[in-house]
């Protein structure tokens, strides 16, 4: 299919509060937390490069819907980077165990785009925001 960077993925996440600044780039390296095989943290000394671009799409009901594009693809990158900014994902059992609004991470892969390897035509696929996430913004 070609190099991985040719595939563009865009995610939507819901966080509590008004994200400030409303757009930007998070350049904060990630590493495992202690002996955990799962949990990650920002670690400027030992972490691997991790870059996330974000932009607030909408604010409603005390929450922000945020568009996120990964420049790198580290485990839990979006979850840890948003927590690092002070805006963890709603319903994230590991980094923000607040299940008041949703019983899973409020994170959705909504757009995938790439150049078709044979026809060279641009391809784009989208998936609507799930109802449980929409309900948070009502």
Where do the PLM segments sit?
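RNA pseudouridine synthases
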Residues: 1-138
């Amino acid at each position: 299919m070609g190099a991985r960077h040719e595939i563009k993925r865009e995610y939507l996440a819901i966080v509590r509060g008004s994200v400030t600044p409303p757009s930007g780039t998070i350049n904060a390296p990630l590493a495992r937390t202690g002996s955990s095989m799962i949990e990650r943290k920002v670690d400027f000394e030992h972490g691997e490069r991790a870059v996330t671009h974000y932009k607030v799409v909408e604010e409603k009901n005390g929450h922000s819907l945020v568009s996120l594009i990964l420049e790198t693809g580290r485990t839990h990158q979006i979850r840890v980077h948003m927590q690092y900014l002070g805006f963890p994902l709603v319903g994230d059992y590991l980094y923000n165990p607040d299940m008041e609004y949703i019983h899973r991470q409020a994170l959705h892969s909504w757009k995938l785009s790439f150049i078709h390897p044979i026809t060279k035509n641009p391809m784009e696929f989208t998936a609507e925001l799930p109802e449980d996430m929409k309900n948070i913004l009502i």
